[in-house]
Amino acid sequence: MILGLALIPSKAFQDEVNAYRKRYDAHYATIMPHITIKGQFKINDGDLESVKETIKSKIEGIPTIDIHATKASNFAPITNVIYFKVEKTETLERLFNQFNNGDFYGVADHTFVPHFTIAQGLTSQEFEDIYGQLKLAGIDYKETIEQLSLVYYDEKEEKWKVLENYNLA
């Protein structure tokens, strides 16, 4: 079973992000807008209940998370991915570190950059054109996320789905 942990925003913000993703993100149909807290990891099906209990214990005392998407940014030249940057807060970083310090299915592959992906799989020309437009348009969105979502990859439908939500304190 392939799992991951994510913060999923409100439907209103998902709709705003998806307005861009529909046009610019090849993975639009496979996963909802989210901030990755723990990248994908594999477990044996028999370990699922243990994983759920570990998640519950690791989020104890972590409050709801205020997010503020502040601007369009990118991961160039490493990859032509454009995203809405989310201000890194102490609480957001604490939650990320709880699941990426090596005692829960390894460490993160990359430095934590909280964001919502809006465009990927672009040619260099597409990247330049789209990034220029998005940078000018800007974004200033705030909301509080109250749950951490355990997501799984449904291999039959080839998409990520929410398996369970965990309330933050």
Curated annotation (Swiss-Prot):
Keywords: Hydrolase. Its EC number is 3.1.-.-. Signal peptide: none annotated. The active site is at H34 (proton donor), H115 (proton acceptor). One of its GO terms (molecular function) is hydrolase activity, acting on ester bonds. InterPro entries: 2H_phosphoesterase_YjcG-like, Cyclic_Pdiesterase, YjcG. A motif (HXTX 1) lies at residues 34-37. A motif (HXTX 2) lies at residues 115-118. Belongs to the 2H phosphoesterase superfamily. YjcG family. HAMAP family: 2H_phosphoesterase_YjcG. NCBIfam families: PRK13679.1. This is Putative phosphoesterase SSP1770. It comes from Staphylococcus saprophyticus subsp. saprophyticus (strain ATCC 15305 / DSM 20229 / NCIMB 8711 / NCTC 7292 / S-41).
